[in-house]
């Protein structure tokens, strides 16, 4: 049985329209975990799975406005797609980590106004193909996933510790 993620990869849509480019022309950044399995990229931001956290979806942002560079967005890929359906693209979902509810609502509304017909069509295709509904309260959902998240199992590369000055805990 194919997974939802495998079915997503097989869909003939431009994933870049969802802010999930399939290639990162910039190469790996210091904060990308060593074992990250990329889902897609939005500039320097990588959306990925980390095997030590199962089906959970993460964002890795070297220019993060939060106090961390790697943070969870969804419990699983299905919920991640539902978040994208609620927000139009992955961008507003990734921004939740440093926003309050009002700022998120303003950002999501502004981003929705900028969506192209092609972006809307890509999201509609996802919804049609998978029969999923948009996440009802994306802000609350993501904040709940991030609350009390234990990132101690993230497998950072040596470069992460060199750049941040943090000590590796073995």
What is each of the regions a protein language model found here?
Residues 1-65, 91-92, 98, 109-170:
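A surface-exposed partner-binding patch
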Residues 59-100:
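Compact, glycine/acidic-enriched structural inserts
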Residues 102-106:
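Core mature regions of organelle-targeted
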């Amino acid at each position: 049985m194919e997974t939802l993620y495998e079915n997503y990869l097989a869909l003939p849509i431009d994933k870049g329209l969802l802010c999930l480019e399939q290639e990162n022309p910039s190469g790996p950044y210091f904060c990308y975990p060593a074992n990250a399995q990329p889902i897609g990229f939005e500039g320097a931001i990588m959306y990925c799975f980390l095997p030590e956290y199962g089906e959970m979806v993460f964002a890795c942002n070297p220019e993060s406005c939060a106090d961390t560079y790697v943070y969870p967005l969804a419990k699983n890929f299905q919920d991640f797609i539902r978040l994208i359906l609620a927000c139009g693209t992955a961008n507003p979902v990734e921004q939740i980590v440093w926003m309050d509810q009002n700022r998120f609502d303003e950002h999501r509304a502004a981003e929705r106004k900028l969506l192209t017909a092609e972006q809307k069509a890509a999201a509609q295709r996802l919804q049609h193909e998978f029969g999923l509904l948009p996440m009802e309260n994306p802000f609350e959902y993501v904040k709940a996933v991030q609350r009390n998240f234990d990132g101690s199992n993230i497998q950072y590369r040596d470069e992460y510790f060199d750049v941040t000055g943090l000590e590796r805990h073995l």
